[in-house]
Regions:
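A short, flexible loop at the N-terminus of ABC-type nucleotide-binding domains that lies
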Residues: 8-22, 72
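The feature captures the beta-strand-to-loop junction immediately N-terminal to the Walker
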Residues: 36-38
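Helix-to-loop junction immediately C-terminal to a conserved catalytic motif
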Residues: 51
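ABC ATPase NBD coupling module
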Residues: 55, 67-81, 111-115, 231-237
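Conserved ABC transporter NBD signature motif
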Residues: 59-66, 126, 224-226
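ABC ATPase C-loop
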Residues: 157-158
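H-loop/switch region of ABC-family ATPase nucleotide-binding domains
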Residues: 201-202
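Conserved beta-strand-loop-alpha-helix hinge in the C-terminal portion
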Residues: 221-242
C-alpha cells in the first residue's frame, strides 16, 4: 500500500521534475497488476520508490502490514523481487549459475557452501525453463544469452517467494520468441507461488490479457485503475482514448 507518495528530482533547479505526485494505491494479496503509461509517466520511479533506490519526499510505503518507508534497499530486497529491462542487470556475470542462485537463495547473506540438497533444488527450479541450464550449473552466467539470463533472473527473484514481485518491462529487450517464453514462465511462477506482482509493459494487449488488474499512469498519478470483469470488456482502443 502507498499513501500520498511524492518524489521530485532536482528540486529548485531548471531540471526540476515531479515524478510521483501524492500517489496512493492499495494492492490485495495475489493481485497481478499490469502498468501502462507514456515514457516519463512515473512507472519506473514508482518501482524504485518501492524498492528503496531512493527515499520519497513524503508519504508512506507499507508492505504486508509493515511500514518500510525509511528502510534501506538491502533490507527491502529480502521481501521484494525486482526484474529490470536489461537482462544483464540481475545477475553477476563472473559467477556461475550455481553461485548466482546460491546468492539469491541466501537473500542478501554471503555465499556459503552449497549443499547437495540445494544443488538439486536449483536444478529443479531451472528444469521447467527447458533451456538446459540445469546441466550448465558451473558455467559463468556471462556466457548465457539475454533470454537465458532473464529467465535465470526470474527464477532467482522467486527462489524465496517475495512479498512483492516488480517486473520493469522485463521482456522488452528480448526477441519475440524468447519474450513469449519468459512471459509464460512469469505467469506460471506467479500462479504457482500465488505472488503479488506489478508489471510495467508498453504492450497494451498484454496489459489487458495478463493478471487481474491494470493501472494507467500519467505525470506521477494513477489516472485509471481497472480490474476483473470491467477490465475484461476493454479493448486497446479504449485504453488509447483515455
Amino acid at each position: 500500500e502507498l499513501k500520498n507518495v511524492s518524489k521530485t528530482f532536482n528540486p529548485g533547479t531548471v531540471n526540476e521534475k515531479k515524478a510521483l505526485d501524492k500517489l496512493s494505491l492499495n494492492l490485495n494479496e495475489g493481485d497481478f497488476v499490469t502498468i501502462i503509461g507514456a515514457n516519463g509517466a512515473g512507472k519506473s520511479t514508482l518501482f524504485n520508490a518501492i524498492c528503496g533506490t531512493f527515499y520519497t519526499d513524503e508519504g508512506q510505503i507499507i508492505l504486508d502490514g509493515e511500514d518500510i518507508t525509511l528502510q534501506p534497499d538491502y533490507i527491502r530486497a529480502k521481501k521484494i523481487g525486482h526484474l529490470f529491462q536489461d537482462p544483464m542487470s540481475g545477475t553477476a556475470p563472473g559467477m556461475t549459475i550455481e553461485e548466482n542462485m546460491a546468492l539469491a537463495g541466501s537473500k542478501g547473506g554471503w555465499l556459503s557452501h552449497v549443499s547437495k540438497k540445494e544443488k538439486e533444488l536449483f536444478r529443479e527450479k531451472l528444469r521447467p525453463l527447458n533451456m538446459g541450464l540445469e546441466d550448465r550449473m558451473h558455467q559463468p552466467v556471462g556466457l548465457l544469452s539475454g533470454g537465458q539470463r532473464q529467465a535465470l533472473t526470474l527464477v532467482m527473484a522467486t527462489i524465496n517467494p517475495p512479498k512483492l514481485l516488480l517486473l520493469d518491462e522485463h521482456t522488452a529487450a528480448l526477441d519475440p520468441g524468447t519474450a513469449e517464453k519468459v512471459l509464460n514462465l512469469t505467469k506460471s511462477i506467479i500462479a504457482e507461488h500465488h505472488l503479488t506482482c506489478m508489471m510495467i509493459t508498453h504492450n497494451m494487449q498484454s496489459a489487458l490479457e495478463l493478471g487481474n488488474r491494470t493501472f494507467m499512469m500519467n505525470s506521477g498519478h494513477i489516472i485509471f485503475d481497472t480490474a476483473n470483469e470491467e477490465r475484461s470488456k476493454l479493448t486497446v482502443n479504449d485504453l488509447l482514448e483515455r
